[in-house]
């Protein structure tokens, strides 16, 4: 088989249709085990894939409305009065673990509405 120069290869590509060029690219990818995707695009996709899907809600501070926060902790966790009070009195306290990120944000908003400070981890 005769060896093609770069110029000859490019000239042969100029005579092909887009569909034929696409077939050549796929054949090269299969033959050499490589991808024609741009490295920048692959690097940009990585942070999107790393976006968290779960969060843990942690009570940092009860604020001024401690009684309201205790009631909310009981409602959310199902803890008894003493356990809920203990959690509120000794921050940081994990309220709920491994929640859907959207549910965790909604729960954080509930706590902030009664004056508590909450973090999502």
Curated annotation (Swiss-Prot):
Keyword Ribonucleoprotein found: yes
Keywords from the UniProt entry: Ribonucleoprotein, Ribosomal protein
GO molecular-function term, one example from the UniProt record: mRNA binding
Keyword Protease annotated: no
Gene Ontology CC: cytosolic large ribosomal subunit
Superkingdom to which the source organism belongs: Bacteria
InterPro entries in UniProt: Ribosomal_bL12 (IPR000206), Ribosomal_bL12_C (IPR013823), Ribosomal_bL12_C/ClpS-like (IPR014719), Ribosomal_bL12_oligo (IPR008932), Ribosomal_bL12_oligo_N_sf (IPR036235)
GO biological process: one example: translation
Short name of one Pfam family: Ribosomal_L12
NCBIfam families reported for this sequence: L12
Family label: Belongs to the bacterial ribosomal protein bL12 family.
HAMAP family the UniProt entry points to: Ribosomal_bL12
Subunit comment: Homodimer. Part of the ribosomal stalk of the 50S ribosomal subunit. Forms a multimeric L10(L12)X complex, where L10 forms an elongated spine to which 2 to 4 L12 dimers bind in a sequential fashion. Binds GTP-bound translation factors.
Purpose of the protein: Forms part of the ribosomal stalk which helps the ribosome interact with GTP-bound translation factors. Is thus essential for accurate translation.
Name this polypeptide is given: Large ribosomal subunit protein bL12
Gene: rplL
């Amino acid at each position: 088989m005769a060896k093609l120069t770069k110029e000859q290869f490019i000239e042969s590509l100029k005579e092909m249709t887009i569909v034929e060029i696409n077939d050549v690219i796929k054949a090269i990818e299969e033959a050499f085990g490589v991808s024609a995707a741009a490295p920048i695009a692959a690097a940009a996709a990585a942070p999107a894939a790393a976006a968290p899907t779960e969060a843990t809600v942690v009570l940092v501070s009860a604020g001024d409305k401690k009684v309201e926060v205790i009631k909310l902790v009981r409602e959310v966790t199902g803890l008894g009065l003493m356990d809920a009070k203990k959690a509120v009195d000794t921050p940081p306290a994990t309220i709920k673990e491994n929640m859907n990120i959207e549910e965790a944000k909604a729960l954080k908003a509930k706590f902030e509405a009664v004056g508590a400070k909450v973090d999502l981890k």
